Amino acid sequence: MGSRAELHTLLGGLSFLLLLMSGQGAKGGSFKESQGVCSRQTLVVPLRYNESYSQPVYKPYLTLCPGRRVCSTYRTTYRVAWREVRREVQQTHAVCCQGWKKRHPGALTCDEAICAKPCQNGGVCVRPDQCECAPGWGGRHCHVDVDECRTGVTLCSHRCHNTAGSFTCGCPHGLVLGPDGRTCAEGASEPPTSASILSVAVREAGREDRALRREIRELRGRLERLEQWAGQAGAWVRAVLPMPPEELQPEQVAELWGRGDRIESLSDQVLLLEEKLGACSCEDNSLGPGLSRRR
């Protein structure tokens, strides 16, 4: 009797442990599947829309039946018709926990972490306010440059120069940097590397970019002056013309164009006469006979 009671107690304890383990496993799996989701809501959304369907149409007609009798029958045709449809659909809505957000409004997961201050220098926000930095950078927001030359690891055989997010190696006089970019060896200077060529190209591109920006500024200034001149010219033309330019007929435009040519010719003649008169001078500041000086 006692052994049976002990067995019953043991089985009950095992059942409780199995139930507890299964509950923990389900809870852990649910958390892993729904990372960043605090709750889910099922909403009933009413829909109302129009849909097309094939509507039968019965058309009667007369035909000749056996026995030379006239019979009335019908044939069925179909046409496209529209009808209003109303239905309700269930839509699941996920509520994100603090520090998480959805990749798009309709997503059912909240797998994009939020960092109050953006991760810098190629860092990625992997958990709320936690950045995963790119190699060569550290700090909470990946804003601190890691000095590889002071990590205690020998990276260069001679000289190590720290750069932003990386490092470069250098060699003393008489030695050249090897193909690995870290060790130095004796030998003639190697041809320029793609990195040095790229650096020169970048500098040239920078100069060209500055020249292009300067030219763009000059062109913008010219364009502004042309627009101002065009506005003044348009106002002058509208003041001189007997009617708005858009109401002129082709023959009127041709006549005005001819007048403009004649005015330009007369203007050139007047300018020539002014130049000739400016070159004339009288001796002793005296005028010719029959001419009197105005006072």
Swiss-Prot record:
Record GO biological process: vasculogenesis
Positions glycosylated per UniProt:
50
Q: Any coiled-coil ranges, and where? A: 202-233
Which residues span the membrane? none
Q: What is the name listed in the Swiss-Prot or TrEMBL entry for this protein?
A: Epidermal growth factor-like protein 8
Can you say where in the cell this protein is located? Secreted
EGF-like domain residues are: 111-143, 145-185
Residue span of the signal peptide, if any?
Answer: 1-25
Q: Which UniProt keywords apply?
A: Calcium, Coiled coil, Disulfide bond, EGF-like domain, Glycoprotein, Repeat, Secreted, Signal
Q: Which GO terms describe its molecular function?
A: calcium ion binding; signaling receptor binding
Which gene does this sequence derive from? EGFL8
In terms of PROSITE patterns, this protein maps to: ASX_HYDROXYL, EGF_1, EGF_2, EGF_3, EGF_CA, EMI
GO CC annotations on file: cell surface; extracellular region
Q: What is its main location?
A: secreted
Q: Please list the residue ranges annotated as the EMI domain.
A: 34-112
Q: Name one Pfam family in it.
A: EGF
Q: Give the disulfide map.
A: 38-97, 65-71, 96-110, 115-125, 119-131, 133-142, 149-160, 156-169, 171-184
